[in-house]
Amino acid sequence: MRSLYFPAFALLGLLAGCDADKIKDVAANNACSLDGPVGGAQVHANVPFEPWGWAYNVAAGSVPKDVTLQIINAKNHVVLTAPATRVPRPDVAKAFEDSNLADSGFVAKLDISKLESGTYLIKVIQQEGNLRYNCASPNKFTIQSSKG
């Protein structure tokens, strides 16, 4: 009977390693800010839309290179996903007294011309290794579109 323990433990070890590369979602709502658009803003679908703010990884005190923004409609469906670009935010580094946050800013240029009129919010997603830090902004904004 003891001879079965080793193969069983070896198999469990292999199976546990299968999840090592899976992306893990982590809530990070205290480590970001969507500074624009401000809550209650009305934006027009035919005008360039450039949301901006800052975000970092609180646990590691780092600034993940990869940032993605998701536009989420009132039905909680993701209707647009686009990469954001990191930009300098010396004000954030100063506010947190941490020079590592000097490049914690982000900005994106999104084409929202195909979106319908309605209320939306933005989720900021940072990825570092197999961890994906999700930060949902409480700022809701309205898109005015000719599509209705």
What are these regions (language model features)?
Residues 57-65:
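A short beta-turn/strand-edge loop motif at beta-sheet boundaries
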Residues 64-82:
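Extended low-complexity, serine/threonine- and proline-enriched intrinsically disordered segments
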Residues 130-148:
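Short beta-strand elements
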Residues 14-17:
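C-terminal motif of bacterial Sec signal peptides marking the signal peptidase cleavage site
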Residues 89-109:
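Aromatic sugar-binding surface patches on proteins
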Residues 112-117:
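Surface-exposed, short loops/turns at beta-strand junctions within beta-sandwich domains
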Residues 118-122:
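A short tyrosine-centered beta-strand micro-motif
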Residues 20-49, 55-56, 147:
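Short, compositionally biased P/S/T/A/G/V-rich stretches that sit at domain boundaries
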